Design a protein with these regions (language model features):
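Alpha-helical transmembrane segments in inner-membrane proteins
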Residues: 1-312
């Protein structure tokens, strides 16, 4: 265990060091302007990338544990789609001209999507995992339709920024967004740690968990609530960076399959490393253009998702 943590910490430290050092502009550490670029632009962006990656990975492993389904992640369950739909509608209504309003609407969209998925998946007195996944897929299709209509009605001047946000971007990262996402992630991990033993028992099935005294519906509510809130916050500030919550938990389980309490920080470290590295590549692969982070995570995630689907 200690070796796995050490390896992930070293990889994250290397990724952060490289991401801070390299970019579209070379930094001279003796130059005042370079130090300002580092403190106001590059460092908050790199730390936000780490926070976003950790958040999505923690949400992903929580969804997979609750649903006992290896294909579950915030992107597939419709949480990310709800946030994107909220942002698209806000853009169509020209709310983007009010600073900070689009992320707030996106966050609200993520929470509404979570509530809708839960209501659709509810069956008598329990939540059906299969219905939950199907509900997420159906809602994603609905959100896609609303997004297309919203973009068709959006003013041209706001459309470019909205499209970049949809593809995942950390451009314009601020210390405020770093603190917001990191704080929510810390609170969520503490909350999930308190129900970690119950989540571990849920892996063996709801009936077995109930027989051992677990309040299954309460644990589901806490788990889904915590994972959805941090996902909404992450998507609100970075747009859609898909497949992190799917890819990272599976890779981490190759080295650690036991206690859920230790799986959470391992996934957080792995997710942070992946998104920091993806952001670095998106900034330097083409010098004059910043590519969307979501494209790189999708390139890694789609083949992995298909292999999981085939095995399942």
């Amino acid at each position: 265990m200690s070796r796995a943590v050490l390896i992930l910490v070293v990889l994250l430290a290397i990724s952060i060091a490289l991401a801070v050092t390299f970019g579209s502009v070379s930094l001279d550490w003796n130059d005042e302007t370079a130090r300002m670029i580092l403190l106001r632009l590059r460092l908050p962006r790199v730390l936000l990338a780490a926070a976003i990656g950790a958040t999505l990975a923690v949400a992903g492993v929580t969804f997979q544990t609750l649903l006992r389904n290896p294909l579950a992640d915030p992107f597939i369950l419709g949480v990310s789609g709800g946030a994107a739909c909220g942002a698209a509608v806000a853009t169509a209504l020209r709310l983007g001209r009010i600073p900070g309003l689009v992320p707030i609407v996106a966050f609200a969209g993520a929470l509404l999507a979570t509530a809708a998925v839960f209501l659709l998946a509810r069956r008598r007195d329990h939540t059906d995992p299969v219905r939950l996944l199907i509900s997420g897929l159906v809602l994603n299709a609905f959100f896609s339709a609303v997004i297309l209509i919203s973009f068709a009605l959006s003013p041209q001047s706001d459309l470019t920024a909205a499209l970049k946000w949809m593809m995942g971007t950390l451009f314009g990262a601020t210390w405020t967004s770093v603190i917001l996402v990191s704080s929510l992630l810390a609170v969520a991990m503490i909350v999930l740690a308190f129900v970690a033993n119950d989540l571990r028992l849920l892996v063996f099935g709801e009936e077995d968990a109930k027989a051992r005294g677990v309040d299954v519906e309460r644990v589901k509510l806490i788990g889904f609530g915590a994972a959805s809130i941090i996902t909404g916050a992450a998507v609100a500030v970075s747009g859609i960076i898909g497949f992190v919550g799917l890819l990272v938990p599976h890779l981490i389980r190759l080295i650690w399959r036991r206690d859920f309490r230790l799986l959470l920080p391992l996934c957080a470290l792995g997710g942070a490393t992946l998104v920091v590295a993806a952001d670095l590549v998106s900034r330097i692969v083409i010098r004059s253009t910043e590519l969307p982070i979501g494209a790189f995570t999708a390139i890694l995630g789609v083949p992995f998702f298909l292999s999981l689907l085939r095995r399942s």
